[in-house]
Amino acid sequence: MKASVFYGKDDIRFEEVDKPDISDKEILIQMKACGLCGTDIHKVTEELVPSGSVLGHEYAGEIVAVGKEVSDFSLGDRVTGGIHVPCFTCKQCSRGHYTLCPEFKKTNIHPGGFVEYIKLPEEHVNHLLYKIPDGMSYSEASLAEPVACCIHGQKAVDIYAGDRVLVMGAGPIGLIHSQLLKNKLVKEVVITDVSDHRLNNAHEFGADLTINTGDTNLEMYLQEQGHPGFDVVIIAAGISALLPQAMNVLKRGGTVVCFSPFTVKPVMEIDASMFFHDEKSIVGTYSVSPYEFEEAILAIQNGVINTEALITHEMPLADLGKAIELTQNKTENVLKIVLKNE
């Protein structure tokens, strides 16, 4: 079978790899669509994975082989799912903190998502595989993973109808957050970014106000407008300098949600008095638990997520390198790129 294989930041090869065999409790799917995530791009550009790795985790496909002990799925089923599965028995799992389970990151699909065929191990079949509803395309279904991650992230903080929320970053993740927030009837969603291309799209995804922080001082602008500040700030861009800025525009008692890994200068200074006097807080959020996938699929199915506008490009699986380059150069109106295997 063919796969897009990582050998270096400028070396992605579409080549033959071994097609996985499955056991009696496993499933093989033919990958039909796999979304390109910012995490994939970060791993490629920073060369954080071994040479010969297959990336990709936002997958959807058709079951083409079923182990004889699998009873809940059949040949031809259209499915989507995640990559990490908790044990469900440890202390973290018993408290509902599934993404903190020691076994969580040890589990994965094989060999990755940017490949013609994916093997789903027993734990994925049992806990992290979902049938795609009729009428939902494979490309739409591939959005279930990032939507589920955003749902998980928003559960890390109390968000109420009538709240004012700032989303820092107008990429696909920030725009998904915006739509989920609007579905919660928040009073205001403000989105910041340094790209006019992306900010021009943001109103289509629920933003009430957009601010280009490349040429506008956010704190000064809000003060001049008499803005009361935000109940919640979601950082959806991996830039550590955003964290002090987020803290400064929070209301007293507000919370910053660190959704993205800080890939640029992760060490920073923050005025610690805000934690005591103003009861401001910071929470982190990582990945997704199995239960948020069902919510994500329903959100897509019910039109909470504008999939047609979010997916701006569909490209052949062989063009992964081109897709990464297209996302990075930011000269086009690029939001979500989905790699197709047809």
Briefly describe each language-model feature range.
Residues 20-34, 47-91, 133:
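Glycine-rich beta-strand-centered segment in the early N-terminal region that forms part
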Residues 157, 205-280:
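Glycine-rich cofactor phosphate-binding loops and adjacent beta1-alpha1 units
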Residues 89-168:
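NAD(P)H dinucleotide-binding glycine-rich loop of Rossmann-like/cofactor-binding domains
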